[in-house]
Design a protein with these regions (language model features):
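Ubiquitin-like/PB1-type beta-grasp interaction modules and other compact soluble beta-rich domains
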Residues: 1-80
Length: 81
């Protein structure tokens, strides 16, 4: 699946997009798996209360199953006006 990172999440991880093969069942499992890779992922995901997640462009929670997701995106909350 494609994993996308936006704004300061991208800056901390150092890439905007990567292809990831995973056995993770949920978003939380994917975060744990990525965080185990390198410290830069740990830094980006250290406070998941301030990171939003979307699967195939639909906002989801950490306990959401990945299922057959083609894309998972991580980004900070945004405001508009």
């Amino acid at each position: 699946m494609d994993v996308l990172y936006f704004a300061w999440v991208r800056e901390r991880i150092g890439v905007a997009k990567e292809q990831v093969s995973t056995d993770a069942c949920t978003v939380a499992d994917l975060v744990k798996e990525l965080s185990a890779r390198e410290e830069r992922y740990q830094v980006a995901f250290q406070d998941m209360a301030v990171v939003k997640v979307a699967i195939d462009q639909v906002l989801v929670s950490l306990d959401t199953p990945l299922g057959s997701a083609k894309e998972v995106a991580f980004f900070p909350p945004m405001t508009g006006g």
